[in-house]
Amino acid sequence: MKLAACFLTLLPGFAVAASWTSPGFPAFSEQGTGTFVSHAQLPKGTRPLTLNFDQQCWQPADAIKLNQMLSLQPCSNTPPQWRLFRDGEYTLQIDTRSGTPTLMISIQNAAEPVASLVRECPKWDGLPLTVDVSATFPEGAAVRDYYSQQIAIVKNGQIMLQPAATSNGLLLLERAETDTSAPFDWHNATVYFVLTDRFENGDPSNDQSYGRHKDGLAEIGNFHDGDLRGLTNKLDYLQQLGVNALWISAPFEQIHGWVGGGTKGDFPHYAYHGYYTQDWTNLDANMGNEADLRTLVDSAHQRGIRILFDVVMNHTGYATLADMQEYQFGALYLSGDEVKKSLGERWSDWKPAAGQTWHSFNDYINFSDKTGWDKWWGKNWIRTDIGDYDNPGFDDLTMSLAFLPDIKTESTTASGLPVFYKNKMDTHAKAIDGYTPRDYLTHWLSQWVRDYGIDGFRVDTAKHVELPAWQQLKTEASAALREWKKANPDKALDDKPFWMTGEAWGHGVMQSDYYRHGFDAMINFDYQEQAAKAVDCLAQMDTTWQQMAEKLQGFNVLSYLSSHDTRLFREGGDKAAELLLLAPGAVQIFYGDESSRPFGPTGSDPLQGTRSDMNWQDVSGKSAASVAHWQKISQFRARHPAIGAGKQTTLLLKQGYGFVREHGDDKVLVVWAGQQ
């Protein structure tokens, strides 16, 4: 989850005119929005490590290690000591995109362990390719190009094939007798990430749940009526796309009302994205009911598609007028008839008058009233600057991310249920003796696994919750999935354990501490820009793919091109398909990548446009050829675990660029003819 734009202006201005500095390093240069880099030649030895930005000193919060993401905190009296084991050129990379800075330290090796064999981009004259396959397929073997379905017989170690006209010059080569998809492997997963609300409306009857309604303007931050039934209706489409895991936005009950959207408060912002959870025991009514969820999960499993829930344990949602009125917490500066006169019969119907913005509703709220706000979550549950609650801290674990209430997941004090739940008659939450906030959250989340057979979680804001909490969630969810599979042997896809991937801003292809605390994969934030550099020449992915294939023999990542928190990747048109789907490790398609879903209305929050409605009219229209291209490559990927899990050997070809991926008995050869 990226910080809500309406609060970005209140956070430290890391990306403004001031620059980062560190003793012994030249001034940092900005490498894309929010990331800063500096290089220096340093001798072996021990030295203090501090960084400075706009007269603020920062230092690593933990032990200093190479190639690991280090959280930064304000400097203490004693700077940490950095031990350099050899002379070399060291790189400091600071990432501020999550609101708190992180640091990555690396050293340039004298000789990179993997060197690309590609010196210049190959050219193609459009004629058939003669490919030496002698090291991959035996003499006399029938080899099929999966894309065009052409078959050639290996003769003198070679085959000749013409890439299909729509393939962008690709040959996807496999043994011709390969006729079914291989057993599923998370290292080769193709995950489709969808904001359910923006995908497909399968049940119009739930469109205005909790009194939510349209704003009559651009509908930037409103619910757009997508739901679980809509997802079920599109499962055949996803199956044809080669998808074998569906990551859906958190379906749990969200705050009912809105907050001001964007830096200018120019639209109402509802929790359509699922990141402002209010009750982890209920489905949000806009998403549907429990029968809808069961149908979705069962129908997906019948098609070989796993279901992942997006989950949040770091924070709750903001206080909204709708929830204050419904659950009787908080306080207003208004009294008596002033309330109805200013806010109306139903407070959530308030709209800004002349000279006001959607932020102006805050002017009516008395955030200092201790008694009123004690009726909200309660001090045992959250820290916030509201009322008499404990103030947020300044570190990753206790900060109030975008001023969202921070859940005390580190607390060892029994908390009871959230205070306002006593006025929430529809909650399924039951008090459990001795339970802390963390205990409740892991119990509630794992119960969805136990009841429905959810296959995994994508964890939001992982770095803002202590690692033992994630291990506890993984342990409980794993036990829950085992129980569900034992009770539902006819519905279980296989015996694979519960899978968990996480978001930690700036994380790349490295085996960090997250992997030792329950995570099976982490989102690879580096891949988007690496792929952007190879849009015009696929061969330029060679070094990246070789390094990933080598490193990922021991762990896994989830790579993406587009996301709701960064941007839509639309460079190169349908060439994005091969850039993503041929990557080692698990990959994530963001809904509409395959159909070039357009950037939507965005107001003063530049991220809102990445969450536009799925462009179904284009899937069978102007984007049909692009969708077909994605389908071909994704289906090929699903047939061959070697693509995601295999080791890579780059080939020296007379024509084009090619590589072999091999995993166990599975072996494929991919050729790109070159630029035309």
Which residue stretches match the model-derived regions?
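Loop/turn elements at helix/coil->beta-strand transitions in domains of secreted/extracellular proteins
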Residues: 187-192, 239-246, 301-308, 452-457, ...
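Conserved, mostly hydrophobic/aromatic
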Residues: 143, 194, 238, 248, ...
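Insoluble glucan recognition modules
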Residues: 16-152, 165-175, 190-196
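Active-site-proximal helices and loops of the catalytic beta/alpha 8
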Residues: 116-169, 176, 315, 331, ...
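Short, polar loop/linker segments at the starts of domains and inter-domain junctions
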Residues: 29-31, 151-163, 203-228, 574-577
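Substrate-binding/active-site clefts of carbohydrate-active enzymes
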Residues: 183-189, 199-447, 451-452, 473, ...
